[in-house]
A protein has these predicted regions:
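PRPP/pyrophosphate-binding module of the type I phosphoribosyltransferase fold
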Residues: 147-244
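Short glycine-rich phosphate-binding loop at a beta-alpha junction
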Residues: 112-121
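Substrate-recognition/cap helix-loop segment adjacent to the acidic, metal-dependent catalytic center
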Residues: 125-144
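Short helix-capping/linker turns of helical repeat alpha-solenoids
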Residues: 1-4, 9-12, 27-30
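Loop/helix-junction capping segments adjacent to catalytic residues or to phosphate/diphosphate-binding pockets
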Residues: 123-127, 193-194
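Active-site-facing substrate-recognition patch
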Residues: 30-113, 151-180, 220-222
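The feature marks helicase ATPase cores and/or their adjacent C-terminal helical subdomains
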Residues: 2-3, 130, 238-242
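Alpha-helical repeat scaffolds
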Residues: 16-24
């Protein structure tokens, strides 16, 4: 029963994995639903990469899926490569120009717009992470840079390392008066719960900015229940039997 799943993990591409995973799930392998969902995340998420969707009234676009580190040994090669890009972006090693340019084109905001960037835990981290993409967006005509319209006033614990995300003090930044009346697009590396997005958008609107959308490098994939995966797999399995695949 374990053999199908073991072979599927060894396969790097989705096509090679698909049939093996279907048989493993049908045979009752308890690991197979996890592997199937990771391989086909778009089948279990209402939002899709590089497609416009709305989150609590905010038009959003993300370039790809981010998977937590605990799943790293289960990912396809292209997924692992994208996750590495997310880490490199966070560290300021890769501005991910292609990902953000595609996302901005999908968002399709017309007229004068300013990119504002999600405040980080320190000023150093904020500028290291966003200065490269801010310069690219402005030079490429996608959006004016609003990097200097946000000032990090004090260090705080990173939300990604805090045990309680809601317990992290986020009031560690100031917004310039120049934001008043500006149409802005929020730019960040990762969309997970969306709490930070909503709070930041609210604060921007309080100072008079007009939030026209948000662009993310990645969205954290949320694992569906195994029963949901099995229903989807049976649907595709029956379809494959009918088409002879």
């Amino acid at each position: 029963m374990l053999t199908f799943c073991q072979y599927a993990v060894a396969c790097c591409g989705r096509e090679e994995r698909e049939k093996l995973m279907r048989y493993a799930i049908i045979a009752g392998n308890r690991h197979a639903p996890l592997l199937y969902a990771l391989t086909y995340p778009e089948r279990f998420d209402k939002a899709r990469p590089l497609r416009l969707f709305e989150f609590r009234g905010i038009r959003c676009v993300f370039a790809g899926y981010y998977f937590p580190q605990r799943y790293e040994n289960w990912l396809c090669d292209d997924q692992s490569e994208f996750v590495r890009k997310v880490y490199d972006f966070k560290e300021g090693k890769d501005p991910c120009r292609n990902c953000f340019s595609q996302a901005f084109r999908v968002l399709s905001v017309t007229g004068d717009v300013t990119a504002v960037f999600m405040p980080c835990s320190t000023s150093r981290r904020y500028h290291r992470r966003f200065s490269g993409i801010a310069a690219f967006l402005e030079s490429g005509g996608y959006a004016r840079s609003g990097l200097d319209l946000i000032c990090i006033t004090e260090d705080r614990e990173s939300k990604h390392t805090s045990g309680r995300r809601s317990g992290v003090d986020t009031a560690n930044y100031m917004m310039a008066r120049g934001l008043r009346g500006k149409r802005v697009v929020i730019v960040d590396d990762l969309l997970t719960s969306g709490d930070s997005l909503l709070e930041y958008a609210h604060n921007l609107e309080r100072v008079g900015a007009i939030v026209t959308g948000a662009v993310f490098l990645a969205r954290t994939f949320r694992m569906p229940p195994p029963a949901t995966v099995r229903r989807v797999v049976w649907k595709h399995h029956l379809s494959a039997l009918l088409t002879g695949k």
